[in-house]
């Protein structure tokens, strides 16, 4: 969870002069993960929820994600509410990759093409929401509700600012299990975020929490 990152804008050149198209541009933000940039098209990306693509196989569910992986220099794509996070492969040069990403994003959003194969997110081949869950003890239902509310209202908005997301995976014997996605996945500072930031917050408001672990 970082301070607001500097932004840069990539204008659309050589496009038709319709007011909407002529005014469209892609803003970019750095993230705490040096391998990941956050791209903001100035409009909604996901109507609700988020989607994380960690492989070319998963990206087949989305023409845009697939096109980004097809550059050969991308190892992760994440769709947030109003942004797309792209993770570069080891050794990739962002000065060369960034223009390719911006061009693909502009082409997608200007053409208003469907984000997912089939037109929507239903049935796409990405891990479902509950996959990988550790689970909860039914006796802890009230505690779990408090934890989820804190994550939804205090943690996820801050993590989204960094180009990522966080998923609740379970609560067992005082331990909260969370999964990092997008820019936060594989980020060098993700452990510190979990331990110093999120763990401290949850332990402060929910005394039953003793630890937070990555799931």
Stretches with model-predicted labels:
Residues 3, 10-215:
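Domain-level signature for proteins that mediate thiol-based redox and metal-cofactor handling
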């Amino acid at each position: 969870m970082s301070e607001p990152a500097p932004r840069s804008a990539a204008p659309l050149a050589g496009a038709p002069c319709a007011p909407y198209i002529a005014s469209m541009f892609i803003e970019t933000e750095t993230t705490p993960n040096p391998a990941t940039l956050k791209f903001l098209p100035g409009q909604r990306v996901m109507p609700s929820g988020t989607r994380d693509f960690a492989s070319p196989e998963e990206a087949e569910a989305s023409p845009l994600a697939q096109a980004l992986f097809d550059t050969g220099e991308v190892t992760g794509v994440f769709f947030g509410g109003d942004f797309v996070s792209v993770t570069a492969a080891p050794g990739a040069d962002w000065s060369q990759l960034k223009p390719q990403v911006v061009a693909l994003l502009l082409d997608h959003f200007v053409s208003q093409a469907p984000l997912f194969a089939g037109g929507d997110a239903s049935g796409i081949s990405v891990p479902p929401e509950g996959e990988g869950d550790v689970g909860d003890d039914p006796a802890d239902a009230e505690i779990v509700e408090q934890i989820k509310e804190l994550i939804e209202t205090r943690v996820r908005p801050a993590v989204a600012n960094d180009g990522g997301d966080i998923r609740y995976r379970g609560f067992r014997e005082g331990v909260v299990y969370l999964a990092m996605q997008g820019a936060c996945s594989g980020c060098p500072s993700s452990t510190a975020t979990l331990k110093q930031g999120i763990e401290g917050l949850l332990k402060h408001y929910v005394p039953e929490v003793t630890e937070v672990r990555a799931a």
